[in-house]
Amino acid sequence: MSQSNNVTDLARANIRALTPYMSARRLGGNGDVWLNANEYPLGTEYQLTTQTFNRYPECQPKHVIERYAAYAGLPPEQVLVSRGADEGIELLIRAFCEPGQDAILFCPPTYGMYAVSAETFGVERRTVPAQADWQLDLPAIANNLEQVKVIYVCSPNNPTGNLINPADLQAVLALAQGRAIVAIDEAYIEFCPQASVSNWLKDYPNLVILRTLSKAFALAGLRCGFTLANSDIIQLLLKVIAPYPLSTPVADIAAQALSPKGIEQMRQRVSEVRANRAWLQSALQDCACVEQVFTSESNYLLARFTASSSVFNALWDQGIILRDQNKQPGLANCLRITIGTRQECERVIAALAPLPGIDNSNNIDNQNKTYSQTSSIRKGTI
C-alpha cells in the first residue's frame, strides 16, 4: 500500500465522493422568516424534571417508549426511539443491507436522506421515479427488486405533500414479502392521522414505520424519532443502535410532549397549520408568478413558479427563506414553502404579489442571469 501525505486519502472512496445532505441550517441565510425546513414556527417551553446528569441514560427510556406506544396504539415492544427519524433510516440500512452487495430503493422526488444514508454505508441506491401524479410506479418497482433489502416510501411525501395510495402501499408490501423491508416514512402523519398505516403491522411482518417529534410536536431541535415495527425487527435494530441514543434532557422533554397535555397541544398546532395552509394555498393562486399550487396533506406547500430562481432570490433578499426543489425529478421551477404563522404567510404573499407572471418571462430570465452566482450557495434541493 502506497503512502500519502494527504490524510483524506485514507478515507473510504465513497465518502470522499459523497455529497452531504444539504440541510436548511447548513445552507444558512440571514432571514427572519424561515420557511425552508418544515419546522413549526414558534418555540415551545419545557422545564426539566430530571436532574440525574451524572448517570448514563437508559438505551430506550421506559417512560418515552410507553407514552409513544400508547399514542401510536401499539405495545411498547413494537417501538424504538432514536436520534430523530434520520437515525431510524440509517439503522435499517445497518441492520439489513450488506455493503457492496445489497441495495435500497426509493421513488424520487422524495426525501434526500434515504440516498445519503445508503451512500454513507456503501449500499447501492436504486431509484424508481414516481409517476406524473407522484404515485408509485408498481411495475417498475417489481422489476427493480433484485438485491433490494429496504424500500423507503414517504407518505405524506416530502417535498410534494401528497399521500401515497394505500392500495399501492399494500402492493409494495406484497411484492417485498420475504425479500425486503418496506419503511413507510410518516414524519408528517400528524397532519393527516387517518392515513397512518400503523394498524397494518399485525398483517405485514416486513413493514416498518418511521415517525418524529420534529414536525407537529414542534421539537425539531430535540432530535427525537421513533421506529414502529414488529418486535423481531425492533430487537434487530437494538443490536445496532448506539448504547445511549437519547440524552436525559431529551428523554425528559420527549416524555412531556407525549403526555395527554402535550398531545392536545400538538393537535391544536396541527389545526392552526391546516388553517394557515388553506389560506396560503388560496392566496398563492392569485399571484401572477405562480403557475400551480399542489395539494398538500402536510405542513408545507409545493408550488411551481414562472421563474423560480428569481422568486427564490427575491424572497431571500427580503429575509424569507424557502426551499428550492428544481433539481428533484419532475420539479422544475418548484419551491417548497413551510407553513408558518399567519403573519409569515402574509409576508410571503406580499413579497410574491408584485412579481411578474409568464408574460414577463424575458425580464425574469434576465434577472436569473444576475442571480446565477449567488443562487448556487442559497439553494437546497431536497
UniProtKB/Swiss-Prot annotation:
Region (Disordered): 363-382
Domain of life: Bacteria
Transmembrane segments: none
Keyword field contains Amino-acid biosynthesis: yes
Family matches, as Gene3D superfamilies: Aspartate Aminotransferase, domain 1, Type I PLP-dependent aspartate aminotransferase-like (Major domain)
Class of the enzyme per the UniProt entry, highest EC level: transferase
Pathway: Amino-acid biosynthesis; L-histidine biosynthesis; L-histidine from 5-phospho-alpha-D-ribose 1-diphosphate: step 7/9
PANTHER family: HISTIDINOL-PHOSPHATE AMINOTRANSFERASE, HISTIDINOL-PHOSPHATE AMINOTRANSFERASE-RELATED
Homology family: Belongs to the class-II pyridoxal-phosphate-dependent aminotransferase family. Histidinol-phosphate aminotransferase subfamily.
Record protein name field: Histidinol-phosphate aminotransferase
Taxonomic path: Bacteria, Pseudomonadati, Pseudomonadota, Gammaproteobacteria, Enterobacterales
